[in-house]
Regions:
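Short clusters of hydrophobic/aromatic residues that line enzyme substrate/ligand-binding pockets
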Residues: 68, 77, 165-168, 296, ...
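A short, structural micro-pattern
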Residues: 69-71, 362, 388, 451
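Charged, low-complexity surface segments at secondary-structure and domain boundaries
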Residues: 259-269, 300-304, 433-443
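C-terminal, flexible cofactor-proximal segment of oxidoreductases
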Residues: 201, 224-227, 381-382, 393-500
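Flavin (primarily FAD) cofactor-binding/catalytic cores of flavoenzymes
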Residues: 2-25, 31-52, 57, 89-191, ...
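Glycine-rich active-site loop/strand segments that organize a redox cofactor
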Residues: 50, 55-99, 222-284, 288-289
């Protein structure tokens, strides 16, 4: 066999420098760019995105029925009114983001097909230098920035999480993870088994059910769901009164946050009552004869895992119609024609879909180095869930688990812009979270308390994530209702941020 030598891509010698470098052009990165333009227009910035276009998750997820599992009044930005149905499809969300980009001319700041492979901080130079691979030109290039704003999200987009089961290689049909959905998959008239019962499964099944011979959701244990109509009465009433869309958006947003906050508090204070509130509409659809206890009453408490909204109860309508069914059991092994369960039952299938979750990335899985020393984020302590001890001039957007992700995009956008302005006022160029003397002996805790929130993707990565302290400002509150009051007035001169 003749092997062809491939010459390594050349490294471009010119290093482009910016005041701020935003990583990712998904909903977080686009939001960050907006806040910079609006609040710190004097700052130069660039957005580096590894994909072919903007959108992040909404670009990479291509499976049938892809939609939000949060309402768009709160998942959308506070500055861009949402005018559609509360739960939106992937295409509607991409269109919404495109409108933001067009309205603010953000396209000129975004560099697509730029994958960051390394980020090195130099205290001598007081800047980050990033090594970047360009897929469009097959070049390796470099950028430098005074401040790094990580908006990469927490999915590993390359592939999803699929456990290994005995006999998978024996199955004659395709085994597909939704995160790697093939465009040519034909499921019309086929028997389909979806392994998993999270938000992805709850989206796939009602979208596919009308075309399949039958579709089965196979789950090891039940999941909580939140059934809601895909309309908003308050929004409809306000629009009938010709209230401006900006007002409609803000009023409905506040009402949803109020209602959702009450439900969350109910779940924390009276979990049994919250459980019944979640199960009642399922019983109303499926009837008293359906085994709700086995298939839809989880072993964990409400809100220990994220709860997906099911618009119009479409998943359960499919079950009631007979197009879909649920099996609660464990997999013994795959067979040539389906799955053998530990109960001894078999599920015949032409296609098996492993909707078994995703793997988290840690700060984009980028190799970080600070003054020549490789950075282990698991050894850092978070400052307010957005910066990290010993890591200069960097902030990360990590959204909420119990509320819409984008609520924190806006809060962190305000905070970072306020911090950048404060640094200008002080005449400094470096800010680093640093433990004060009184913090040295504080108890260190996981990034998220597993007793409070424990989905599989988080449990698999918890040892790789930064830790939090038992006091402010070292807590990762992950609570919108707390942070909307605390972050805007957080003291930037309390000694926890060291300026140079």
């Amino acid at each position: 066999m003749i092997e062809t030598a491939v010459r390594p891509a050349e490294v471009e010698q010119v290093i482009e420098h910016f005041d701020v470098l935003i990583v990712g052009a998904g909903i977080s990165g686009i939001g960050a760019a907006h806040h910079l333009l609006e609040q710190r227009p004097e700052k130069s910035f660039v957005v580096l995105e590894s994909q072919l276009g903007f959108g992040g998750t909404w670009r990479t997820h291509r499976y049938p029925g892809t939609r939000s599992d949060s309402d768009l009044y709160t998942y959308g930005y506070r500055f861009k009114p949402w005018t559609g149905a509360p739960i939106a499809s992937k295409d509607e969300i991409v269109k919404y983001l495109a409108e933001v980009i067009e309205a603010e001319d953000l396209e000129r700041y975004i560099r697509y097909q730029h994958t960051i492979t390394a980020a090195e901080w130099s205290s001598d130079d007081r800047r980050w230098t990033l090594s970047v691979s360009r897929a469009d030109t097959d070049q390796r290039v470099q950028f430098s920035a005074n401040f790094l704003w990580m908006c990469q999200g927490y999915y590993r987009h390359a592939e999803g999480h699929t456990p290994t089961w005995e006999g998978m290689d024996r199955f004659k049909g395709p085994i597909v993870h939704p995160q790697s959905w093939p465009d040519d998959l034909n499921y019309v008239g086929k028997r389909v088994v979806v392994v998993g019962s999270g938000a992805t499964a709850a989206t796939l099944i009602p979208a596919m059910a009308p075309d399949c011979a039958h579709i089965t959701m196979l789950q090891r244990s039940p999941t909580f769901f939140f059934i809601r109509p895909n309309t908003n009465e308050v929004a409809d009433m306000l629009r009938e009164l010709d209230v401006p869309e900006e007002w409609v958006h803000e009023i409905v947003r506040r009402k949803i946050l109020l209602d959702f906050g009450a439900l969350t508090q109910l779940a924390l204070d009276y979990p049994d009552l919250a459980r019944e509130e979640l199960l009642r509409p399922i019983r109303e659809i499926l009837g008293d004869d359906y085994d709700i206890e086995t298939h839809f009453n989880p072993h964990y408490q409400p809100w220990q895992q994220r709860i997906a909204i099911i618009p119009e109860g479409d998943l359960f309508e499919g079950i009631r119609s007979g197009q879909a069914s649920v099996v609660t059991d464990e997999i013994e092994c795959f067979t040539e024609s389906g799955i053998l369960l530990k109960s001894g039952a078999t599920l015949e299938a032409d296609i098996i879909i492993t909707a078994t979750g995703f793997d988290m990335n840690v700060l984009g899985d980028i190799g970080f180095v600070v003054d020549g020393v490789p950075l282990d984020f698991a050894r850092t302590i978070t400052y307010r869930g957005l910066m990290f001890t010993g890591v200069p001039n960097m902030a990360e957007v990590f959204g909420y688990f119990r509320a819409s992700w984008t609520l924190r995009v806006d809060l962190i956008g305000d905070f970072v812009c306020r911090l950048l302005g404060h640094m200008e006022e002080l005449g400094v160029s470096v800010v680093t979270p640093t433990l004060r003397d009184e913090d040295q002996d504080m108890t260190l805790l996981p990034w998220v308390d597993p007793a409070d929130f424990n989905p599989g993707y988080l449990a698999r990565m918890i040892d790789s994530l930064p830790r939090q302290g038992d006091r402010d400002p070292w807590r990762h509150a992950s609570n919108y209702y707390e942070e909307r009051e605390a972050l805007p007035v957080a003291d930037l001169d309390d000694g926890a941020l060291r300026y140079v």
